[in-house]
């Protein structure tokens, strides 16, 4: 692992469930100084209650200033106007962000930092923070999200890819597309906290009380219930197999009404990351019911490896990154395909198969991913 580096990381807000970004930076903070910059926003807020709550949370973050997570990791919430893609506003934000981030970096003790960004709209900050190198870490096709300024984001991302010293991409498709603009682009898959999710196999771990009385088998999902989740598919599976329990865990930011009329669908809401192994212990199969579109064909679902590290059989929509796990996960097409694949997964499951899935995830830890990334960073030059 790289050591004694200063890193300014631009990503989503630190608070919340761990993601690839938080896993990587938490590990790096063991030997390096990290300034994590909370999200500066990639879309304009709407008049929705969700956006109003988010703006209020941003206001509270601004008041907090620099927040210490551990001795080497601090979180900053700089001031920015949430109107991305507007030229005058983008220039203003660049000035505001440059001044505030330089201030926070000094307070956190950073010198000659690596600028490590997960966000295309930070391209205007390249060259302004005294950085030693620039890393663009692409984990999604951002222009495919709903409500974003697509053309502006594509232009920002292309400029960022061209200027980066190193580009990391979490799927082969993302890497191939960005390599057209920068040959220093590398595919680095997501990792998994194997020890955490493997707790699901422990006989001493009790399943959550709210799942104990549910009829088996339990077909489970955890994660954000968002635009890329095929709710119609889930509802139809539930109708076809009323003897199955469809258990959905996660915050929903879309209308889930199509599921609420199904007596065998249970929406439990968001649960703490620490409790997910216990919920996995209740699952008989883990599903990844994604819509197949421009966003998801470039995705590499974290939950794939998390389900497998919990020993679960997995049935997923047909995504390129899932296909690589043939023998560990099944891909399915449509309602008929999902029902048949789940039936097969249930019939072929057993303790030996669950242990084998956990063992297969051992080389895919977040620590291993950080070592892989560190080797790539060591191969890049330091900016003059």
Where are these regions (language model features)?
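Membrane-proximal helix-turn-helix segments that form the acceptor-binding/catalytic region
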Residues: 99-106, 127, 149-167
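Nucleotide-sugar donor-binding and catalytic loop/hinge architecture
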Residues: 1-3, 201-218
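Nucleotide-sugar-dependent
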Residues: 229, 274-279, 286-309, 316-327
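A charged, aromatic-enriched C-terminal amphipathic alpha-helix characteristic of glycosyltransferases
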Residues: 350-377
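Carbohydrate-associated surface elements
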Residues: 173, 188-200
